[in-house]
Swiss-Prot record:
GO molecular function: calcium channel regulator activity; toxin activity
Biological source species: Cyriopagopus hainanus (Chinese bird spider)
Family recorded in the similarity comment: Belongs to the neurotoxin 36 family. 02 subfamily.
Signal peptide: 1-20
Residue pairs linked by disulfide bridges in the UniProt entry: C46-C59, C55-C64
Protein name, as recorded: Hainantoxin-X-3
Assigned keywords, A-Z: Calcium channel impairing toxin, Disulfide bond, Ion channel impairing toxin, Knottin, Neurotoxin, Secreted, Signal, Toxin, Voltage-gated calcium channel impairing toxin
Length: 65
C-alpha cells in the first residue's frame, strides 16, 4: 500500500514539473523583457496618445526627435 502511494506521488511530481517547465518556456518566449524592442526612428510621424510603437527619443510636434 505504501509503495503505491509513493509511486503515485512520484508520478504526480513528474507530471507537475513537466507542465510547469513547458509553461515557463512559453512565458520566456512571450516576455517583453526578452524580445527586442522596436522604436520609431527620428523624423517619423508619431501621435503620443495613440501610438503603439514608441519613438527612440521624444514625440514632439507629431514627429519623433
Amino acid at each position: 500500500m505504501n509503495m503505491k502511494i509513493l509511486v503515485l506521488v512520484a508520478v504526480l511530481c513528474l507530471v507537475v514539473s513537466t507542465h510547469a517547465e513547458r509553461h515557463s518556456k512559453t512565458d520566456m518566449e512571450d516576455s517583453p523583457m526578452i524580445q527586442e524592442r522596436k522604436y520609431l526612428p527620428p523624423g517619423k510621424p508619431c501621435y503620443e496618445a495613440t501610438q503603439k510603437i514608441p519613438c527612440c527619443g521624444v514625440c514632439s510636434h507629431n514627429n519623433c526627435t
